[in-house]
């Protein structure tokens, strides 16, 4: 299959690219700055694929730029003809009290995490709808279901992603297009290590003086390979059998499965009351 992965410069995206390429798929590994910031990551991924004789093409794509998205998708379609699977993985983390971020900083978090995947989906869905076939996998977070005090700028963007993805899951069923959500717990990846911190230092100091809301971070976070393995399993499943949500990891995931089950039941009850079908 022809598979597009965003945020493939490292972390989950790189591992997802490699496991799917090893499985025989044509993978379009996208990242921003392949001639600049991520030139080394792009070069290493290309060299790895060439050495393994696997079908990986590295493509420039900045999910916050509509022109970049349009150019990248056009290139993939010109090379491959169509896209079977999209994995929306590109993301940015943030930490600290919401008040410590400027509105522009909060907008940037949402632009990458939420609107970035919406740009991708709008670009690829016409082709999938025309073929009545396709799979969109949205990498969100357990913090898109749970709230921790100083992670909610990031968490809020993930909550929004969850809502958009679930809506698409139902909306695209008549076109036999699957939408699946992967919810990682705590993992050691460059995204979390490079989390955006609010620049309003005076406000940060005020919160630090009175709050004890910094969570105890896990000593042994889960292995990022678990996310790649979960994505592979979803890709391998027959169309129409994939679960809406898949929780991965053991840290920051307690209760998420139960929350998802309760949400699914509540949604079904609501739809039934409206004479609709999920």
Residue ranges and their predicted role:
Residues 1-32:
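Canonical Rossmann dinucleotide-binding motif of NAD(H)/NADP(H)-dependent dehydrogenases/reductases
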Residues 60-71, 103:
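The beta1-alpha1 cofactor-binding region of Rossmann-like NAD(H)/NADP(H)-dependent oxidoreductases
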Residues 97-98, 105-107:
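Substrate-binding pocket helix/loop in short-chain dehydrogenase/reductase
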Residues 101, 147-155, 167:
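Active-site loop-to-helix junction immediately N-terminal to the catalytic Tyr of the SDR YXXXK motif
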Residues 121, 157:
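Active-site helix of classical SDR
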Residues 141:
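Residue(s) in the substrate-gating loop at a strand-loop-helix junction
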Residues 174-242:
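SDR active-site lid
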